[in-house]
Amino acid sequence: MHTLVLLRHGQSAWNLENRFTGWTDVDLSPEGEQEARDAARLLTDEGLTFDVCHTSVLTRAIRTLYIVQHEMGLSWLPVHKHWRLNERHYGGLQGLDKAETAARFGEEQVFEWRRSYDTPPPPLPADDPRSPAGDARYAGLAPDVLPASESLKETVARVLPYWHDVIAPQVLAGQRVLVAAHGNSLRALVMHLDGMTPEAVTKLNIPTGLPLVYTLDGTLRPLAHRYLGDPAVAEAKAKAVAAQGAARK
């Protein structure tokens, strides 16, 4: 049997402000930092430890991982950062208030952009200052690789090569792996691991700061998976994620 832990970053400054974030690089909020410390405690209480860690190239996921490592006394572990684990790119929605966007375009349209499987938000123009093209962390990538917007389907297609090429071989080799990433990049992994349909994954909400522990067999099929901590907390956090696209009443 193999162990894999998936962890969505703690609350970010823009989660707190209910803004579309995507590839925008924002930091954790104070609550997000505490969520990372709490995640470390849950992992320690469960008796879990790790051999290798993976995260995106975005600060909120990196800092979540570093806080967890520090709290667990595992700061020495190797960390692999990769853009393929980034959050879904929200295109022209990035930076906008989710509730105000719902009031402007309608909740149904915003739900389609946020939660559908194959509908991307409006793309960013190439010369938009929010474009990743001028960001040094993506300097080695061909311009046509960088997204201007992504559907969840496109996010899955971006994430899975990293799973197949890097993470899965480590898990199969017996390494205990922690992946600290984002709501949609983790939805992509969960969809693959659990064999979820596109319709099912649109209803999946990943709560912030709660470790999701998978026990996998020798072919990486899930034998069990669960969030650590109080199930009621996980359910409440997942419902809060689902409600983010609603207009203010």
Swiss-Prot record:
InterPro entries: His_Pase_superF_clade-1 (IPR013078), His_PPase_superfam (IPR029033), PG/BPGM_mutase_AS (IPR001345), Phosphogly_mut1 (IPR005952). It comes from the Bacteria. It is an enzyme of class 5 (isomerase). Pathway: Carbohydrate degradation; glycolysis; pyruvate from D-glyceraldehyde 3-phosphate: step 3/5. SMART domains: PGAM (SM00855). It catalyses: (2R)-2-phosphoglycerate = (2R)-3-phosphoglycerate. The keyword Isomerase applies. Its EC number is 5.4.2.11. GO terms for biological process: gluconeogenesis; glycolytic process. The active site is at residues 9, 87. The record marks 182 as: Transition state stabilizer. Keywords: Gluconeogenesis, Glycolysis, Isomerase. Substrate binds at residues 8-15, 21-22, 60, 87-90, 98, 114-115, 183-184. GO terms for molecular function: phosphoglycerate mutase activity. Residues 115-137 are annotated as: Disordered. Belongs to the phosphoglycerate mutase family. BPG-dependent PGAM subfamily. Catalyzes the interconversion of 2-phosphoglycerate and 3-phosphoglycerate. NCBIfam families: pgm_1 (TIGR01258), PRK14115.1 (NF010713). Homodimer. PANTHER family: PHOSPHOGLYCERATE MUTASE (PTHR11931). This is 2,3-bisphosphoglycerate-dependent phosphoglycerate mutase.
